[in-house]
Amino acid sequence: MIPSDVSFNVLESWCGTMERIVIGETRINLRTELRNHGLSGFVLGERMKLMDYIRRNPEFLTSLEPIVVSEGPLIVRMMSRASRKAEVGPMASVAGTISQLSLMHLMGKGSRCSIIDNGGDIALVNNRKITVGLYAGSSSLSGTVGFLLKPGGPRGVCTSSGTVGHSISFGRADSVTVFASEASTADALATSIANSANGPDDISAVENALERADDFREHFRGVMVVVGEHAGTVGRIPRLVMTDRKAVLGDLWDEV
């Protein structure tokens, strides 16, 4: 999805100090144990490759349907692949793809603990347990529960919303969170599933979104959908834990 106003942060410094990278629409909150990682320059380069491709292929920016790309920069091919998996336009995965490429860059430099949050679309590898808080707009679940992530990765945790932020969504989910091995795919799937969160009432909206999610089970590990005071899951999501609402709504990441 296009970067939203949702943000995840790490409160403790065990995975490095918080860094902020802002380049155009890309707004990254970064935690990594690496120094002199050169991520800002890397992200700038990837954005330039994408923008150059869009100048020559403007439909890549505006299409709401998948676009097949056989040749082009890696960022473009990854977005194209994610769009085909999720049956959405390629720009639905731009934030998650940048997060994933950033993680690949850091892991290539030897990182064992890096968390890249690009407007709520996260790619990470972690060597300690982490709790990621659930931000679901005005729902009472927002900030009160989180997901306990075991050490592991690389993986993606991406969220789409029809009520929070400025991302394009045709549904009314407060949050659709997708857990997958790739942030690029998780981002596109979150958008696609959130688009189906409609119905005469909140329960129907959750059920319709979960039914849509079930179509994509081969591409994700788990999905959680929240609409108002109702929620549902498909697949296997990380263990839910209680979180401090005040802490989560300020900084949605915490060390266990």
Swiss-Prot record:
Signal peptide: none annotated. Gene3D superfamilies: ApbE-like domains. HAMAP family: UPF0280. Belongs to the UPF0280 family. This is UPF0280 protein MTH_727. It comes from Methanothermobacter thermautotrophicus (strain ATCC 29096 / DSM 1053 / JCM 10044 / NBRC 100330 / Delta H).
